């Protein structure tokens, strides 16, 4: 036992009941939307395939984290590397996770994290990029927007810009998403700055957003930190470039 001095021992606590992983835990209680090629590409078209509509943003982004219908990128439609899509999603920042709910103990979650400093940048994001975490479990294929790394164009950021990244997890697995070189400023359910991170955990079926300041020129890796998912294609190159 871990103790303050040799010879001390504490009683072994009774283990929690073995949790059951259900379809609901994987955000597919209705079995998800199988068959991504059923006309679900939505209105952003090819622009969504390369990282979102990129529309200009104005003012506060209140209510951004609330559950809402999902618009899937066109690159997911009819894609043999995408075996399911999420239904309405939300951030679920206060969810402890499988086996940790309702056990009589307090479990820390993202909702408990609060930065000791204000938003380090202070600007509203000038544009928004939405990326879907996608895959095909039987083929062990992983990707962003249904496009594996080998086939994907870089995500291009203008040096000095502030943007919002929205991630939607269409899969039944967790994906901790890490952007090299730049900070990820997680937003709360109302779209306000909450805490600075360098990896954003994405449970199944969640939609979470964070702000990025493109303040480091260069070519940066952007990937799932489950490295076998990265090797399977869930990776992009991010290029921070001087404005033309």
How should each PLM-predicted stretch be described?
Residues 167-171:
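Asparagine-centered strand-capping/turn motif at beta-strand->loop junctions
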Residues 1-162, 215-219, 227-244:
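Extended terminal and domain-junction accessory segments
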């Amino acid at each position: 036992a871990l103790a303050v001095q040799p010879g001390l021992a504490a009683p072994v606590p009774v283990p929690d009941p073995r949790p059951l992983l259900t379809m609901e835990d994987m955000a597919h209680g209705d079995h998800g939307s199988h068959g991504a090629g059923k006309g679900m590409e939505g209105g952003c078209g090819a622009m969504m395939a390369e990282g979102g509509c990129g529309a200009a943003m104005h003012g506060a982004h209140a209510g951004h984290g609330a559950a809402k219908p999902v618009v899937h990128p066109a690159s997911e439609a009819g894609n043999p590397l995408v075996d399911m899509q999420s239904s309405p999603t939300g951030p679920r920042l206060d969810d402890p996770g499988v086996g940790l709910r309702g056990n009589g103990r307090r479990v820390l979650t993202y909702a408990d994290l609060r930065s000791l400093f204000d938003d380090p940048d202070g600007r509203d994001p000038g544009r928004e990029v939405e990326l879907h975490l996608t895959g095909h479990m039987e083929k062990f294929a992983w990707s962003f927007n249904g496009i594996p790394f080998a086939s994907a164009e870089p995500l291009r950021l203008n040096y000095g810009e502030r943007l919002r990244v929205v991630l939607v997890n269409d899969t039944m697995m967790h994906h901790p998403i890490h952007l090299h070189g730049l900070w990820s400023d997680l937003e709360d359910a109302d779209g306000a700055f909450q805490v600075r991170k360098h990896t954003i955990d994405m449970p199944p079926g969640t939609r979470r957003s964070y702000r990025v300041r493109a303040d480091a020129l260069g070519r940066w890796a952007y990937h799932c930190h489950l490295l076998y998912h990265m090797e399977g294609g869930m990776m992009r190159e991010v290029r921070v470039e001087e404005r033309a």
